[in-house]
C-alpha cells in the first residue's frame, strides 16, 4: 500500500505541483484547500487527486481532516505544510486582523497539522514533514512584517520539531523558495 501524503494548499500554485509530483512518485495524495470549491473540483477532475476542504488555521478542523483522510486513505505518513496567505501592508497601515490571519494560517497551520498527525507518526515510528517557508522569512520584505514573521517562525518550528522527531523516525524539514509565478 502506498504511503499517504497530505499537501495543504495542495490544489493550486506550489501545492498543486507538489501534489502532482508526489502522485507521480507513487504516493496516495490528499490535497487540502480552504476556499475555491470550483478550483478544487477542477483540480480533482484533472489529476484524480481527492481534495479535502478545511482551514488550517482551525485546529479542530485539522484534526477532523486528518481523521477523515485516514479513514478513507490510510495512515498519514507525510505532511507538506504549504498553505499560506498574505495580507500585505506596511506596519503603519497593518491592522491586528491582518497580522493574526497570516500568523494563524502560515505558522499556526504548521502546528495544527503536525499536532493532528504527530501521535500516529510516533506510534508508527515514521513520518515525513516538509514545511514551506519563504526567502522573505530569512531576508524580510517591505510591507510584509506579518508574512516574514510567520515564515521565519516556520524555520525555528522546523528545527525544534525535527529534534523531537528524530529519535522516532520522523524527519522535519523546511524549504524557503523565492518568488514563484503561479
Enumerate the predicted regions with their spans.
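Residue(s) in the substrate-gating loop at a strand-loop-helix junction
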Residues: 134
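Conserved glycine-rich Rossmann-like NAD(P)H-binding loop of the short-chain dehydrogenase/reductase
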Residues: 25-40
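Alpha-helical segment proximal to the catalytic Tyr-Lys
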Residues: 119, 163-164
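Conserved glycine-rich cofactor-binding loop
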Residues: 11-12
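Active-site loop immediately N-terminal to the catalytic Tyr-X3-Lys motif
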Residues: 92, 139-145, 167-168
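Active-site helix of classical SDR
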Residues: 114, 150, 158
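Substrate-binding pocket helix/loop in short-chain dehydrogenase/reductase
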Residues: 90-91, 95-103
Amino acid at each position: 500500500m502506498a504511503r499517504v501524503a497530505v499537501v495543504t494548499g495542495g490544489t493550486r500554485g506550489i501545492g498543486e505541483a507538489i501534489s502532482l509530483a508526489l502522485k507521480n512518485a507513487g504516493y496516495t495524495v490528499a490535497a487540502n484547500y480552504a476556499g475555491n470549491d470550483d478550483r478544487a473540483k477542477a483540480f480533482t477532475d484533472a489529476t484524480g487527486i481527492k481534495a479535502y476542504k478545511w482551514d488550517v488555521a482551525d485546529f479542530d478542523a485539522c484534526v477532523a481532516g486528518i481523521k477523515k483522510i485516514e479513514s478513507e486513505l490510510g495512515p498519514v505518513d507525510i505532511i507538506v505544510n504549504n498553505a499560506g496567505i498574505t495580507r500585505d501592508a506596511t506596519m503603519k497601515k497593518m491592522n491586528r486582523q491582518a497580522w493574526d490571519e497570516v500568523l494563524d494560517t502560515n505558522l499556526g497551520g504548521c502546528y495544527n497539522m503536525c499536532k493532528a498527525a504527530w501521535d500516529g507518526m510516533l506510534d508508527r515510528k515514521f513520518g515525513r514533514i516538509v514545511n514551506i517557508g519563504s526567502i522573505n522569512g530569512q531576508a524580510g520584505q517591505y510591507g510584509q512584517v506579518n508574512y516574514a514573521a510567520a515564515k521565519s517562525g516556520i524555520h525555528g518550528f522546523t528545527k525544534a520539531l525535527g529534534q523531537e522527531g528524530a529519535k522516532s523516525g520522523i524527519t522535519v524539514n523546511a524549504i524557503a523558495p523565492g518568488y514563484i509565478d503561479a
